[in-house]
Amino acid sequence: MANILSVRGLSFGYQGNQVLRGVDLEIPQGSIFGYLGKNGAGKSTTIKLLLGLLPIEEGEIFFRGVNLREAPLLLRSYSSSMIEHPFFYPFLTVSENLDYLDHIFRLGKGRKKEVLSLMGLNDHANKRAQSLSSGLKQRLGLAMCLFNHPEMLILDEPLNALDPQGIYELRSILKMLNQEEGVTIFLSSHILEELEKLADHVAIIHGGKVIYQGDISGLIKKQSNIVKFKIDNTSIITQLGYDSKFSLVEIHDANHVSFEIRNENEFAQLIALMSQERIAIYNITYQESALETAFIHLTE
């Protein structure tokens, strides 16, 4: 799959504070690409550089193979963005907001009807934007973004301020846009559980550097799973010589212990070792690694 956007060696600082330190990104065309990081990691700064809202100090950004140093507004010509909050005119109705865009882009009333239907806004067309729920405001913001047929959507924390129903609806809409409309979606987020359900590629930024980039399944497979069980006395565990094969995570108390294991075979071997040493075990729980576990492990 070809890359629609490539970032190479991108660095940026504010008043002596270095925010980005040689960031490299490869965003495949047609993907949903999740950009993960803690607050202050550099996600929003990266997005502002992509959109030409900040000058490129060091490094290069290529969109469709063209260096944005030579064409700084190219990405903005073929993409739409929603940064922090959806853009619309609050005192206009949903329909009037789209009429305004039609006046700019001259795509005809047919496009307005398409976007209203696509975003499920037909029943809300005559409502003032300021009266909409948070979820509907996000839909209107996306409708505004989609009006000019962008190849790519760039969204900064789009799941913020949404309730669980709103998150579910937005996730469904983004998947539909990607799968049915062919829109490449680049979004930053710290809501890892939802991003795991949505994105097919991720990059993790920490301390201004990208520390992982690839598909989610590959990231999770690199992480260990956790098995926890109860035994009669955890003091025997320290005498076992398990260290070469199994990693002890924690002795929780006199009766509970956790181990880190990489696969089901190691799980079976650990249970066999307990049996061989005549250690009775109870209440076994097996926690598979998830995106959140991997993220915490990489950024701690």
Predicted segment positions?
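Primarily ABC-family ATPase nucleotide-binding module
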Residues: M1-N3
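ABC transporter nucleotide-binding domains
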Residues: L5, F12-H206, Y212
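Short phosphate-engaging motifs
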Residues: V19, G108, E194, S235-I237, ...
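Short, surface-exposed acidic/glycine-rich loop or hinge patches that mediate macromolecular interfaces
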Residues: V66-R69, R106, T234, R262-E264, ...
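ABC transporter nucleotide-binding domain
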Residues: R171-I261
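C-terminal coupling/interaction segments
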Residues: R262-E300
